[in-house]
Structures are given as structure tokens and as C-alpha cells.
A protein has these predicted regions:
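Glycine-centered coil/turn sites that cap beta-strands in beta-rich domains
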Residues: 452-470, 474-496, 504-507, 516-519, ...
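Right-handed parallel beta-helix/beta-spiral solenoid domain characteristic of secreted/periplasmic
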Residues: 57-60, 72-122, 133, 166, ...
Length: 553
């Protein structure tokens, strides 16, 4: 009976298993049957052949044809289009849209899309493209948007580099965004590096249309601009494009309803939005009827770090900031139009080369909705930070204030000087905030040390300790520190998420003490590795400790 059951089960599974196939596409030669030895020479045939669960492997080369999806995958059976060799990614270079996704459960992994500065969006994800995953791709050289999304839900954009979206010119402002989304639900943008855009790195919703967008998560991303290294489109070398890192908009008809769009920014770094090109250039332009949570956000070197805007014809934003760091902005906060809710908890602000912390315009903020606690301010403490848990800080508070390492020194007056805040459960690095002993600022004390610092707490008791790398996320390099309390044979290695060894930083006998090494984002052969999450592991005798770090290109 059991044998009959197994046979029956196998017969049921065989039709499902038989659907799984791999097809290959090459950029030259005659058209084949899609096998590795005789690949297709065009995407259309491969996409027509591919069924849910199938994989299309794109061989290295330059393709002058675009990719347009033909059918949807299914939950658990995605249609995957990916680079055959991630170290030699295929280039899709077309005069126009290079990728169009109109179907659901599609994954695109490891391709380069070049729009050749044609007048089209480089990548389009349309209303049929729910549950799209776009991963490990480079999207470049457009005069419109890098990724244009329209009513596609549950989309993941991960570990992508998006750059040189340049519409108009310095004297003729035309928006070209890195990613623009309209009517989306449950969008996640993770581990992306977006730069050199004439519009915003990310904007939602430019059309202020229906359906209303909601639930956007942007995490572990770097959004920036700076002088162009070379002429591009109608822009000249040295000119600085870009409006904002992030800009939010909604449909004005939502103002009288209970709707309030949710956007979460977690470990997002934004810099380079200096004066020029537009008035009030800000890294974060958060406005209209949104609820924005910023956790571990870093803003530096901007005209305005945070432009936060209250009720107008389209409503006003609610803002909560936790474990944020901001420095060297001309204006840290420009607060407008009686902003109703602004909560700032456990953050570190260094005025540095900036001029002022708060520029309150057209009513500024509603005092009843302002709550600033457990935060550090250098240079001066603004009136908005009157709560006793906010401290005026100087270089003695930090490991290396001049180097913008705002981890607390072991003798920092910020240690145990805070108040408990239920909304704050850990620090910038993910270390827990313990009730009754909150530190002030973005970091809990004792989580990382500099050379010459002594250790505290559990780190003293342990013979070995591997510290969180700094900075994290990082580009191009990061420091990894560890302490050993006796001479020992040590290996410090870096691995990708597949468990493959990428780089060995240390292998040999070391004396006791604190040791510091820098990883430059290269493998053992000296080649740059791609953006993504990496594991670093310390082995010393029988001791092993691992941590994660995030490289952003």
C-alpha cells in the first residue's frame, strides 16, 4: 500500500517538476533551441518559451534589444531572468526602454540596462508587474526615469545601482528620477545606490493620482549627488544635478479621509544636495499627508538636511526620527506650515560647518506636536531641544567627532544620561537600549572603541571580541576591529551570503590587544565585489564570532 502511495505521489509531482527548465540567450550567432550549446539569440523567443518556474540565463555580451515580459510566473514558481556569469554581467543597451515588466512574479537579476540617454524610462514596471524582484542590476544613462513604476504592488528593488538620469540641463530644469512610483503598495527598496539624477533619487507619487500609494520601505540605501565627472546628455562636467534624495506627494482628495501613507526610511544615507539648481534643495523633502518613520538615517553636506512640511492643500507630514545622524548641513531642519507632528529621539546632530539647526518658516511647527528627547547637539543647543535629556556635546563625547564617528567615548557624559522612550528599543548599530540606562545620542556607549580606548562590560570579560564594522553601510571601505586578550592564531575572513569566501584580511599569529583592519570592498584577487550584504568572521583558537555588513556601490 505504501509503495502504491509513493508511486501515486510521484505521478502527481512529475507534471509540476517537468515544467522547470533553463533557457540560454546569447548576443551573437544564429538562433538556436535555447540550450547552453545552442542558445537563443533574442529575448523574445526565450520569454515565449519560459513557463512559471523557468530560468532564462543571459550569457555575457552586449544586447541591442530590449526585454519585454510575455507571461506571469506564480507564487513559488517565478520566471527568472538572470546573468549567467554575475562577474561578467550582460549589457542591455537600447535607444529607449530597455526593460518592461507587465506580468507578475518576475525576477530580473544581475543585468546592466543602459538607456543611451534616449527619451524613455530605462525600466518600466507596469500595473501587471506585481511581486517583481529587480536585484543586482545597474540602470544608467536616461533622460527620463531609471525605474518608472505604475500601480505595481509588492515589488522589491534590491542591491541595484541607478545613475545618470539626466533630463534637461542645469539652466533648463527637467525631472528625471532614479525611481518614481505611482499608486504602489508594499514597495521595498533595499541596498541601492542612486545618484546623478536631475530629479529626485526617489519620488512618490509625481502624479498625485489614484489609487493612493502606501507602505514604502527604503533601507540600507545611499542617495546622493555631486559634480558630474564628465559631460553627460546636456549636462556639463562639474555641474551638480538633483533636487532631493526623497520627495513625497499624495492626492489632495485624501486630505479629508483617514488615509495617511506610510513610508519608512531605515539606514538611508543622503548627501551632496548643496545650494543651486533649485531653491531650498534638501536631502529629505517630506511633505503632504504621509507618516514618515526615519530610523538610522544619515544626512550630511546638504543645503537642507530635512525639509519637513506641515498642512497645506494636500495635508501635512507626521515625522518620527530615531537614531539619526546629521552633520555639516547649511540648515539641519527647515520646518514649514505648522508641522503637526515632529518626534526626534536618540539622535546626534553636529552643526559642523552648518549655520543653524532649525529654520522655522510660515508657522514652523506646532509646539504641541514637537517632542525632542535623548539627542546630542554640538556647537549650540537649539530652543527646540529644551528637554533635560538633550545635551550640548563636544568632541569629548565621541570616539572621533572630527572624523564623524559619533560612537560614544567610554567617558562620555551621554552615557546613562537619557530617559526611557518606549519607541526606541535599540541604537544605530542594533545594540539594545536597556530600561533605566538609556544613553543620549544615536549610539549606546561601549559598542565600539577606538585605538587606545579601554573596554567595558561583557567585552572585558571575553577573551576575544569582534566589533561592528564602521561605517555600515559603507562605500568604498570600512574598518573592522577586534580584540584578543592573549596571543593567538587568528583568521578574519569575509564571505558572501552563499557562504563563499571573498577575502581573507588576517591569517596568522597576532599579539594580544586591539587590532584594526580595513576592507576596501575587493576580493582576494583585487577585484571590486558587487553591492550587497557580506558576513565577516573572526576565528581565534576555538572562538568564532560573525557579523554582517552592507557594501553599497
Amino acid at each position: 500500500m505504501r509503495k502504491i502511495f509513493y508511486t501515486f505521489s510521484l505521478l502527481i509531482l512529475l507534471p509540476i517538476l517537468s515544467f522547470a527548465a533553463t533557457y540560454y540567450v546569447d548576443d551573437s550567432g544564429s538562433n538556436g533551441d535555447g540550450s547552453l550549446s545552442n542558445p537563443f539569440n533574442n529575448f523574445s523567443d526565450a520569454l515565449n518559451a519560459a513557463q512559471p518556474g523557468d530560468v532564462i540565463m543571459v550569457l555575457p555580451g552586449t544586447y541591442s534589444q530590449d526585454i519585454n515580459t510575455e507571461r506571469s510566473g506564480q507564487p513559488g514558481q517565478r520566471i527568472v531572468i538572470q546573468a549567467y556569469d554575475p562577474a561578467n554581467r550582460p549589457l542591455i543597451s537600447t535607444g529607449g526602454g530597455a526593460l518592461s515588466i507587465d506580468h507578475s512574479y518576475i525576477t530580473v537579476d544581475g543585468l546592466i540596462f543602459d538607456g543611451e540617454f534616449d527619451g524613455s524610462d530605462v525600466v518600466k514596471i507596469s500595473s501587471g508587474g506585481d511581486n517583481t524582484i529587480l536585484r543586482n542590476c545597474e540602470i544608467r544613462n536616461g533622460t527620463k526615469d531609471g525605474i518608472d513604476m505604475n500601480e505595481a504592488d509588492d515589488v522589491l528593488i534590491e542591491n541595484c545601482e541607478i545613475h545618470h538620469m539626466l533630463g534637461g540641463s542645469l539652466s533648463n530644469q527637467v525631472d528625471a528620477h532614479g525611481i518614481v512610483a505611482t499608486g504602489e503598495q508594499n514597495l521595498t527598496i533595499r541596498g541601492c545606490n542612486i545618484y546623478y539624477t536631475s530629479g529626485d533619487c526617489f519620488q512618490t507619487d509625481p502624479n498625485r493620482d489614484y489609487p493612493l500609494w502606501d507602505n514604502v520601505l527604503i533601507e540600507n540605501c545611499t542617495l546622493w549627488t555631486g559634480p558630474l565627472p564628465a559631460d553627460a546628455a546636456d549636462w556639463n562636467a562639474g555641474e551638480i544635478p538633483g533636487e532631493n534624495a526623497i520627495d513625497t506627494k499624495i492626492n489632495e482628495d485624501a486630505v479629508g479621509t483617514s488615509y495617511r501613507a506610510k513610508i519608512t526610511l531605515r539606514h538611508v544615507t543622503a548627501y551632496g544636495f548643496v545650494p543651486g539648481y533649485i531653491n531650498n534643495r534638501a536631502a529629505f523633502n517630506i511633505k503632504e499627508k504621509v507618516d514618515c518613520l526615519m530610523e538610522g538615517v544619515v544626512a550630511y553636506g546638504n543645503e537642507i538636511g530635512f525639509r519637513l512640511r506641515g498642512p497645506g492643500g494636500r495635508g501635512g507630514a507626521y515625522i518620527t526620527m530615531i537614531n539619526c545622524i546629521s552633520y555639516d548641513n547649511d540648515i539641519m531642519f527647515r520646518v514649514e506650515d505648522d508641522l503637526e507632528v515632529l518626534k526626534i529621539y536618540n539622535s546626534t546632530f553636529d552643526l559642523g560647518s552648518g549655520n543653524e539647526y532649525f529654520d522655522n518658516v510660515s508657522g514652523g511647527y506646532d509646539p504641541n506636536g514637537l517632542d525632542v528627547r535623548n539627542s546630542l547637539f554640538t556647537g549650540e543647543k537649539p530652543d527646540e531641544a529644551s528637554h533635560s535629556s538633550n545635551l550640548l556635546a563636544n568632541s569629548s563625547f565621541f570616539i572621533d567627532m572630527s572624523g564623524h564617528n559619533y560612537h560614544l567615548s567610554l567617558s562620555s557624559p551621554a552615557i546613562n544620561a537619557g530617559v526611557d522612550i518606549p519607541e526606541v528599543t535599540d541604537d544605530f548599530d542594533g545594540n539594545p537600549r536597556n530600561s533605566g540606562s538609556y544613553d543620549v545620542g544615536a549610539y549606546e556607549g561601549g559598542t565600539i572603541t577606538g585605538i587606545g580606548d579601554e573596554l567595558a562590560g561583557d567585552e572585558v570579560a571575553n577573551d576575544f571580541y569582534l566589533y561592528p564594522n564602521y561605517p555600515n553601510p559603507f562605500n568604498p571601505g570600512t574598518r573592522i576591529a577586534f580584540r584578543i586578550n592573549r596571543a593567538e592564531t587568528v583568521q578574519l575572513s569575509i564571505y558572501n551570503l552563499l557562504g563563499q569566501a571573498v577575502r581573507t584580511l588576517v591569517s596568522g599569529q597576532l599579539a594580544e590587544g586591539l587590532h584594526n583592519y580595513t576592507w576596501d570592498g575587493r576580493n582576494d584577487f583585487g577585484n571590486p565585489v558587487s553591492s550587497g550584504i557580506y558576513i565577516y568572521r573572526l576565528e581565534a583558537g576555538s572562538f568564532t564570532q560573525t557579523r554582517k555588513m552592507h557594501l553599497i556601490r
